[in-house]
Amino acid sequence: MAGIGFELRKMLRRNTLTGLMQAYTYAGLIGAGPWVLSIVGILLIGVLSVPFVKPNGAVTQFQVSVTYLIAVSLVLTGPLQLWYTRFTSDRLFEKRRELVLPNFHAVMLVVTAASALIGALLALFAFGGQTAGYRLLMLAGFVVMSNIWIATIFLSGMKRYVAIIVVFFVGYAATALAALALKGFGLTGLLAGFVAGQTVLLCGLLGLIYRDFDSDRFISFEIFEKRYRYPSLMLIGFLYNLGIWIDKFMFWYSAGTGQPVIGPLRASIIYDIPVFLAYLAIIPGMAVFLLRIETDFVEYYDAFYDAVREGASLQHIERMQRAMVEALREGVWEILKIQGMAALILFAAAPTLLHWLGIPALYLPLLYIDVIAASMQVVFMGIINVFFYLDKRRIVLWLVGAFVVLNVVLTALTLASNPAAYGYGFALALFVVMLASLYWLDRKLDTLEYETFMLQ
């Protein structure tokens, strides 16, 4: 916990407004940086390329192609993300650091093989009408993106947040520059620039990993042994990523809202733009989440379990437990307040923002509900992260499973309704699971001492 938590606590100890603002800015950039850089990078490439790329629809084809690469690679690697993070954390706790890198190579090999096989089949049979260059670049991009998520989740688990944001900035700067340099080659040039930039990003992430870890063995498949498997974490990783994207796929492939773009890929103009903009509003909530979880909560969490392991007095254990619970409740309440304020500010600025971007005011109602949904997603993410600290995997599995089911059912109902209802399926699904997660968290915190001592 030393890395980011130590830096944030150092800023907060100054007890100045500047220190507080610096800590929030630092946490916001780290917490939401990769998301924001990804969104801004793709949008920037599109905006700057429009006047130069022919045919006119090539930029849209590029943005849609990249969106699918991101979405499908996230869902594909979801089962491995949390599983490998848990494996690595356990080996570091056991002081078996030499096992980390060989098993990372094994995971990368499996991800590369799976993404290459799936990508090759899709390139051959689903994109038969496209050029060989486009199909090869989509295949390469799919493999690279899949490996990026594994490397990113690994470094996140090791609390290398600052390094991640720096590498993502360099990677997306390289992506934008390469894509713009090759824009004269149309869609193929833009996609080649994207793949080149993402390769730079992946190399940067791998460089961070190799700098911190070494081993006498190159590869080891211990992670795939039965004793190290975590089926619940595999399902959670898959279902969470599926839940985030399933409503988008439903809008893309619905006859009334989706339009064909290139090959089998479709997009929903009415749904996609507000969603992209709404996710830019999560920065304040992510800042508060990271600041409060990695400082106050983690500090008391460590103190509580250290007291339990070291046999401290009951009074001290109870005091640490109360402090941990209070820090957590204050943190959740602060996330709700700050994210709510950010949503209200965006509501007020939305008409001007859409006008400045040249987007019709018709998108305003959907943007509003998407901002609310994104805000609830931040709260939901924060709570399930706490459940992971408490090792309540079964609860998280139920929550993300319910999220997927509710998102599918409610989005289907809104699609069958009228355009005024669009976006409410995703928002209502998040609202229900957010309330459920708050309820379960409150219950588990009340019984934390009992479960700590009696259920071991």
Predicted regions and their residues:
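Interfacial segments at transmembrane-helix termini and the short loops linking adjacent helices
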Residues: F125-M138, Q321-E330, M341, I345-S375
